[in-house]
Structure formats: structure tokens, C-alpha cells
């Protein structure tokens, strides 16, 4: 009882301290506030434990077991013992006989050897190591004169080689050039004929008349060479290059009469021998909008 009163007094003091710290202007420091909260929690736990202990002591105790001995106990039926079948009964109901280890280790000399099932005598053709299913395939990394697949034809491996000097792509078969391969003379059926070899020109190589005539003859007629666009096609037009007079006149009419001298300067630039110099001189005297129109 005294512990409960002390805990209650601590709770009241802690609550008063927290209330005063919240109402005053500066408040208390953090560590003091934490200490007050810690004391408040411990006092509350002590008060609740003492309260519950007092309530538990006031409860009536249950009756002892001796007094309940006079109560009528329910009759428990006696279980019948396990009925073990005798030796003469059916074998299905008999328990298995435990054998010694010596009996298990004795060789089965009197008994006949066990026969394998009929499916074990005939091995599966796919799993037979001597069957043709697991026969090693002939290597194709080089030209072979033996039979491959029963067709009696040699096989070659194809490799494409790029010549850095002439920029020509050549097909090489098993380390030999196409014309030096020893298996070229062997006849081949129509099904195994390889497609005709092509010589591909590298990207950017043009056949517009600037290349060598011998290289143009090697290319098949159905091969259409791709012409690479020149750098000048993608570059913006020079500022001094003459433009269409109709476009300039339309732009001048749109932007106003501030560009009245543009047509005269443009005609002078067309008549001059060096258009770049005249264009630079004309653009130097024009404004920013005029330069944009000429560039357009």
C-alpha cells in the first residue's frame, strides 16, 4: 500500500513538472524532460502492478482438490487388450517376421538367378552407344576427302576476309581462297550447291566512275552499289552563294521595305567572278535579318 502511495505521488510530481515546463516561456532542457518522463513511466508501472496485486488478493481462492474427491467421477470404459493373431490364422493378418543380419548376407545359391524383364534385353536404339544415332559427326572446320553423311562430298568452312589495301571483301574457304580450295573440283549435287560468292564493297565506296574498272567487273550485274552522299550535299549552303531571286523577293515583300537594296546586291554578286568575296562584302553591310534570309 505504501508503494502505491509513493508511486502516485511521483506521478503527480512528474505531471506537474511537465505542465509547468510547457506553460513557461523557456521550458526545460531536453535531458531533464526525458528524466521526468522516465520517472513518470516507472511510477505508473509500479502503481498498476500494486493495484493489480491488491485486486488479486481480494479474489476468493478455488476449492482444494480433496473436497472435490467426493464428486462422482464418470465411468471410464476399460480398453480390451490388443488381440494378437495366432499362428494358424490367415497369413495376411500376421506380423512380418524380423530376420537376422546373417540370414540376409547368405548367398542365394539354391535359388535361380533373377531374370531381367523383356524390355531390358533390347536396349533402346537411341541410347545404344554402338548405334548410328551417336555416331560422331564429321568436322567441318577443314576440307575432308572422306564421306560426310553418306554423300561422299567434301565440306568447307567459309570465312570472309577484308583486304585493307584494296578495300575488297573476299570469301575464304578453310584457309584457302575460293579458287585455291582443293574441294572445288569435286562434283556437288544441286541440293548442296553453295550460293555464288559475292564481293561486297565497303560502305562509302562509290561506283560512279571514280573506282577501278577491274573491281567493277568482279561485281555481279544484279548487285546495285550504294552511292554515298557527298559531304557537300549535307553541308549548309555558303553565305555568298546566289539564291533564287523569286524566294528572296517573296521574303522581302513579307519582312517589309527595309531590304530594298538586296536585289541589286544579289545581281551584282551573280555577275562578279568571285561570288564568295562579293557575298561577304554585301553581308558585312547588311543586318542580322538580311543574313538569315540569304542563308535561307
UniProtKB/Swiss-Prot annotation:
Encoding gene, per UniProt annotation: ier5l
The protein, known as: Immediate early response gene 5-like protein
Family recorded in the similarity comment: Belongs to the IER family.
InterPro entries: IER
PANTHER family xref list: IMMEDIATE EARLY RESPONSE GENE
Amino acid at each position: 500500500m505504501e508503494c502505491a502511495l509513493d508511486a502516485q505521488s511521483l506521478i503527480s510530481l512528474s505531471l506537474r513538472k511537465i505542465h509547468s515546463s510547457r506553460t513557461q516561456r523557456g521550458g526545460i532542457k531536453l535531458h531533464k524532460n526525458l528524466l521526468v518522463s522516465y520517472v513518470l513511466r516507472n511510477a505508473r508501472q509500479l502503481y498498476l502492478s500494486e493495484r493489480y496485486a491488491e485486486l488479486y488478493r481480494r479474489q476468493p481462492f478455488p476449492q482444494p482438490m480433496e473436497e472435490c474427491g467426493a464428486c462422482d467421477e464418470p465411468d471410464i470404459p476399460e480398453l480390451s487388450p490388443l488381440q494378437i493373431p495366432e499362428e494358424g490364422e490367415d497369413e495376411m493378418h500376421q506380423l512380418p517376421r524380423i530376420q537376422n543380419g546373417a540370414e540376409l548376407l547368405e548367398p542365394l545359391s539354391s535359388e535361380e538367378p533373377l531374370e531381367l524383364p523383356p524390355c531390358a534385353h533390347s536396349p533402346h536404339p537411341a541410347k545404344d552407344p554402338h548405334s548410328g544415332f551417336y555416331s560422331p559427326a564429321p568436322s567441318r572446320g577443314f576440307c575432308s576427302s572422306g564421306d560426310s553423311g553418306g554423300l561422299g562430298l567434301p565440306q568447307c568452312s567459309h570465312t570472309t576476309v577484308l583486304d585493307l589495301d584494296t578495300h575488297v571483301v573476299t570469301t575464304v574457304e578453310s584457309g584457302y581462297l575460293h579458287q585455291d580450295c582443293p574441294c572445288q573440283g569435286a562434283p556437288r549435287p544441286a541440293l548442296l550447291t553453295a550460293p555464288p560468292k559475292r564481293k561486297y564493297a565497303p560502305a562509302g565506296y562509290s561506283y560512279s566512275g571514280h573506282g577501278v574498272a577491274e573491281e567493277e567487273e568482279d561485281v555481279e550485274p544484279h548487285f546495285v552499289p550504294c552511292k554515298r552522299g557527298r559531304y557537300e550535299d549535307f553541308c549548309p549552303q555558303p553565305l555568298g552563294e546566289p539564291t533564287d531571286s523569286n524566294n528572296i523577293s517573296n521574303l522581302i515583300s513579307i519582312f517589309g521595305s527595309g531590304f530594298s537594296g538586296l536585289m541589286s546586291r544579289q545581281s551584282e554578286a551573280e555577275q562578279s567572278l568571285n561570288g564568295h568575296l562579293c557575298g561577304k562584302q554585301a553581308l558585312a553591310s547588311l543586318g542580322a535579318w538580311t543574313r538569315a534570309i540569304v542563308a535561307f
